[in-house]
Amino acid sequence: MAGPGYDRVDSKDDEPPNIQIPSRTYGFPPEAFDWSRLPDFDTNFLPPEHVEAFIQALSAPDPIPPTPDGGATGSSSYRLNSPAWHRGSTTSFDLDLARRPESSGVGFHDEDRTARDSPAGAATAAAAGVATPGPPLSRRASSNSLFISARNDWAPISQRRVARAKTAPQSSSRNDKKKKRARSKDETREGYLYPLLKWPLLGVVTCWLVGLSVVHVLARLYITVYERYWAWRGERGRLRRAMRATARYSDWVAAARRMDDFLGNDSWKVDDAFAYYDNKTVRRVLAEMRRSRRRAEEAGGRDTEQGREAIEDLKVLIEACVKNNFAGIENPRLYSQTYYGTKNLVQNFIDEVERSLKFLVETERLSKEEKRVMFKGICANYGRTALCLSGGATFAYYHFGVVKALLEEDYLPDIITGTSGGALVAALVATRTNEELKELLIPALACRITACREPISVWFRRWWATGARFDSVDWARQCAWWTRGSLTFREAYERTGRILNVSCVPADQHSPTILCNYLTSPDCVIWSAVLASAAVPGILNPVVLLMKTRSGQLLPYSFGHKWKDGSLRTDIPIKALNLQFNVNFTIVSQVNPHINLFFFSSRGSVGQPVTHRRGRGWRGGYLGTVLVQFTKLDLTKWLRVLRSLELLPRPLGQDWSLLWLQDFGGTVTVWPRCLLSDFARILSDPDPARLARMIHEGQQSAFPKLRFVANRLRVERLVERGRRENRRGGGLGDGGVGSSGGAGGGAGGGQAEAVAGQAAGPGTGQRRPSFESILSEDDLRSLLKKRRVERGGIGSGETESEDETSDLDADFYEGITYDGGDDDAGLEFGAAGMRQPGVATPAGLGGVERGDLS
């Protein structure tokens, strides 16, 4: 068997390796190393026509770049196959264009054909073994293709131009690449001193940065030696080794409790006082909430004045205190003083909130409308949780262990984002159900990781010819297995209930980034977004995103623009997640090798306190902490100086300073422990033994954080349950994914609802972003009322009751499934650019459909 996505080949080199059980299994059973037990191991999810569509998209000419005079360089043209590109429906704008036969020579130029057939243009297809003589298949198949070509906005489209003879030397393309990599005239400051002092300043600052880096590494080495031979000696060292040897979370908790008992951390839990949260407020609210809940439970089902008063008091308390980081109870320092758990007062408060929320969800003494309004407000205040997987080349395989730890304890969030290598892991998680993931996250999965299998004699020639080590088409075939073929973001959401987000950066330096998900790019093919997010300059050339039409055909997305690695600008897109999904609690698994070295928590982190001086000391002593923090902050300062003064050159046409100047952490940051050998094998595929170690280390790094995550998700899932069960219209989203619809929900029940929804037939199991994602409920209701008045449904001077409004809304929801919760999160269709067939359009909206709202 070849790599992921390939057909079976009768070749010994392409067969999986023999099953070998390593000497250390890290708690995995022998069958976990058997590659034949992997689900869909020999399934080829990617049809040949999708590979051909990707090759054609890569071979197509780039959009016309601007020139300083406002025109366009060259004579590139962009072809629009109008029937498929417009998805078979009319748009809100019209183009008065005529179709001309290709033989007439009008509407395209000879330079286009030359550029298209050149070695540079066909490099990707040639590397994949696909012959590309002549124009693309779609152009040869039709003589009425529509072309748009113009040198600028004022030149006529159909003007015939005679191609000039090319007299430029063969090295002109290389010179053009160098010009694109250099700063343009608009980006370069004027003055006499700038060109004179630029390189001397760059040399001085670079030497200073190198010196600071050496001091930082030496300081970290000193702290490592200090902790190993001083802090972790004796009994505490033995307990620490016992914790690291565990393979199950329950065993780790037992070892962590023994460590806390040995260090005397239990006394800290009993004492309510702590400077990093308001213990007095928490204590008063806890007592009042417990009293109100017990009074309400004692009243039972009797509708008494005392019972109604108790429920109202409990409702007010819940609305007031179920908020993000209420009174500081979600401060990470509350979980950084012990190996397991937090203050007893905080834990009791969370337990009481859970019991009170469950009572309010199940009580029948509150109307459905009262519950709907209450849980809608609580959901907006409390927010949602997301798992963010960073990039890091083959370091990204540590994410498997983090996901496995969350999955086995049912703490895996519904919102998952990935960048670069993390996007591949996120795509695997978002396209598989919990049961499928448990069968996949084993060491035998290494047999499907074959992206770096080529010898140096193959990839070096490709790098010399194309500037990229890996071939985009080859990676597309392999990536398709991880995404279950050409699934789109919407289809993955409908299948599993998880919201996948992938960060992509445009090839243009100054264009905004995009966070692909089922709202911003619902019809975008996942594997194309994963490839774009992993397209590091020099490793993989920028690629074109693809979208799937109603007929299953793949076409270029976003007008054929090319995209590259998301880690170059937004490794962890926290702001975009907060804007689109109201995420304010993030679990970040950070494995970037250039960041891992500089991460240092001088006063401990969640589940990993400072061991000496009862958690009140400094890691490595005060002197060691001073050296590390001084060098780290000074390095950041000088990197910002280089970027602000425009001293940095642009190797491979990219500003690399943002690789260090981003925010790489979250509310909870997981840092898997790596080895020095991982740096030497950063672009090599792991074998089952190495992958078993990476999964184990990923689990070990996630275990200390699970208690903090569990307390958060216990409350969040009850809020989502109340929101889901009390939506207006009798559960208008039941045909889709219940757990993650709009505002999200529980992890387990939503997947069953998704399967049931799809089994019900087409249309019932499909979730679509509705107009309520853009308009508020009041605005939408007013709009529909106004339209009904215009139709004569409501006479002059008549008033409409709430029941009539609900009936009116039902007419609207016949065509659009309710996407509850998205109206809270401030969502927008920033890059959808597509229309969903079969979605009814309200008559009062003037024919505007979803694809036009961008």
Curated annotation (Swiss-Prot):
Its EC number is 3.1.1.-. PROSITE patterns: PNPLA. It is a single-pass membrane protein. InterPro entries: Acyl_Trfase/lysoPLipase, NTE, PNPLA_dom, Triacylglycerol_lipase_N. GO terms for molecular function: triacylglycerol lipase activity. Residues 96-116 have a biased composition (Basic and acidic residues). GO terms for biological process: lipid catabolic process; triglyceride metabolic process. Probable lipid hydrolase. PANTHER family: NEUROPATHY TARGET ESTERASE/SWISS CHEESE D.MELANOGASTER, TRIACYLGLYCEROL LIPASE PTL2. This is Patatin-like phospholipase domain-containing protein CHGG_02900. The lineage of its organism: Eukaryota, Fungi, Dikarya, Ascomycota, Pezizomycotina.
